[in-house]
């Protein structure tokens, strides 16, 4: 059986996931966002939201994989590198975390320059 979601249903899952995250329920947010991304793995906003939820839920390994996926699809998005750094900190890999954070700062400075 092949299940698909309408754009409206996808937005409903995304917004409810974000709402759960804002209310401090990162685990619930992950459940909703996992459902969205199971059916539409390319949903970038869903992936970004899930990354934040994973970080808030201290799931460093999953967060690191999510951040790496986002970086592979949008390497110039500074926030992806910041999240990767935080995930690597959670995993205890401080050298990699420093490198990712440095990359974040470089992109941030580049994006803010006139």
From Swiss-Prot:
Subunit note:
Binds to YscX.
Q: Function, please?
A: Required for Yop secretion. Functions probably as a chaperone which stabilizes YscX within the cell, before its secretion.
Q: Where primarily located?
A: cytoplasm
Q: What is this protein called?
A: Chaperone protein YscY
> Gene3D superfamilies under this entry?
Tetratricopeptide repeat domain
Question: What inducers act on this gene?
Answer: Temperature seems to play the major role in regulation of transcription of the lcrE-containing operon of pYV, whereas Ca(2+) concentration has only a moderate effect at 37 degrees Celsius, and no effect at room temperature.
SUPFAM superfamilies in the record: TPR-like
Q: Source gene? A: yscY
């Amino acid at each position: 059986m092949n299940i698909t979601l309408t754009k409206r249903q996808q937005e409903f899952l995304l917004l409810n996931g974000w709402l759960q995250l804002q209310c401090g329920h990162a685990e619930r947010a992950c459940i909703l966002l996992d459902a969205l991304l199971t059916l539409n793995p390319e949903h970038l906003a869903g992936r970004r939201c899930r990354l934040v939820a994973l970080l808030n839920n201290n799931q460093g390994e999953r967060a690191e994989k999510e951040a790496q996926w986002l970086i592979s699809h949008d390497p110039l998005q500074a926030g992806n590198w910041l999240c990767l750094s935080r995930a690597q900190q959670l995993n205890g890999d401080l050298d990699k975390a420093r490198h990712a954070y440095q990359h974040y700062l470089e992109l941030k400075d580049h994006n803010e320059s006139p």
